[in-house]
Regions:
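Flexible, low-complexity linker and terminal segments
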Residues: 1-14, 23-24, 212-301
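Conserved thiamine diphosphate
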Residues: 96, 144-197
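Thiamine diphosphate
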Residues: 61-137
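Short coil/turn connectors at secondary-structure junctions
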Residues: 24, 51-55, 74, 93-99, ...
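Short, surface-exposed, charged loop/turn segments at secondary-structure junctions
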Residues: 142-151, 187, 194-203, 217-231, ...
């Protein structure tokens, strides 16, 4: 299999602390599930001893997309729904970086849904963490693509009438090569699947249920053991390479299953493009872009 994944080399420093990654104080509402995801991210980087200059956090627009401001590392707060194309460019041009994309259910499945699907089918090497709260919180309680039927909001004062999407079904259909699901209130499990996603050579995506305590409190109590819910792990015998089996798990009624639904290996966009560049350079005797352009002009002169 073609691969172009470069190993991440630690610099000469002996120890990296999560304190070095902390930037501005998070401005989320008290109790927001996004705090937990940020904490997991810091712990994961400290555990892996990855220098902050070797990671990048990119986001679109939304409560979750404030993420890059709170991380002392490369990052970008991009246009609504357009973070994935930017992250794709970073991934293709900087293979030495761990590229993380953060977004909410609106950024991922509404305005940015087309970009998510294409990055997934191309198998771009990056990790997308979807912080799903079932509501547009930044715009003060509007119905999102994952809001359940009957949900009352400023855009649906009598209750949502549109069928919500099933994130797992959509992600499996998109062609993503690593798909997982977790809950921000169970940080140990969330960190476990995020680490697996980070290690995956390809497009990895995780839906993390992240409660909006301001505009949709209790949305995920059914999956929270502390609130009397059931956190149903995917059975150990599940074959993560079986797409049909993954679909069957995705069909479960809410709150559904948690863990790795699907995980396969296939050539990444990064590796295929790098191989194409190598072939082109070999065919053109390593001519520079300017020389190739001049050769093109010469053919028409």
């Amino acid at each position: 299999m073609i691969t172009d994944t470069k190993p991440i080399q630690l610099s000469e420093r002996q120890k990296y602390s999560k304190k070095e990654l902390v930037a501005d104080h998070p401005t989320w509402c008290p109790g927001c599930g996004d705090f937990s995801i940020l904490s997991i991210y810091f712990k994961m980087m400290e555990k892996r001893q990855i220098p902050h200059e070797k990671i990048t956090s990119i986001a679109g627009i939304g409560c979750s997309s404030r993420f890059p401001y709170f991380v002392n590392a490369h990052g970008a707060h991009f246009l609504h729904g357009r973070g994935v194309p930017f992250a794709t460019g970073v991934s293709l041009t900087r293979p030495d970086l761990h590229v993380f994309m953060f977004g909410g259910d609106g950024d991922a499945f509404s305005i940015g849904g087309n970009h998510l699907n294409h990055a997934a089918r191309k198998n771009v090497k990056l990790t997308y963490v979807i912080m799903d709260n079932f509501v547009y919180g930044l715009t003060k309680k509007q119905t999102s693509p994952t809001s359940p039927l009957g949900f009352k909001s400023k855009t649906d004062p009598t209750g949502a009438i549109d069928q919500p999407i099933n994130p797992m079904k959509q992600l499996i259909a998109s062609g993503a090569t690593f798909i997982a699901r977790s809950h921000s209130h169970l940080p140990n499990h969330a960190m476990e699947v995020m680490e697996k996603a980070m290690d995956h050579d390809g497009f990895s995506v995780i839906e993390v249920l992240s409660e909006c305590t301001e505009f949709y409190p209790g949305a995920f109590d059914a999956a929270n053991p502390r609130k009397g819910g059931v956190f149903q792990l995917i059975p150990a015998e599940h074959d993560v390479t079986d797409e049909i089996a993954a679909y069957k798990l995705a069909m479960a009624q809410f709150p559904g299953y948690f863990g790795v639904f699907y995980h396969i290996q296939r050539p990444t966009k990064n590796a295929l493009e790098a191989d194409l560049i190598r072939q082109t350079r070999k065919r053109t005797n390593n001519a520079s872009p300017a020389e190739l352009l001049q050769q093109t002009f010469d053919r028409f002169s």
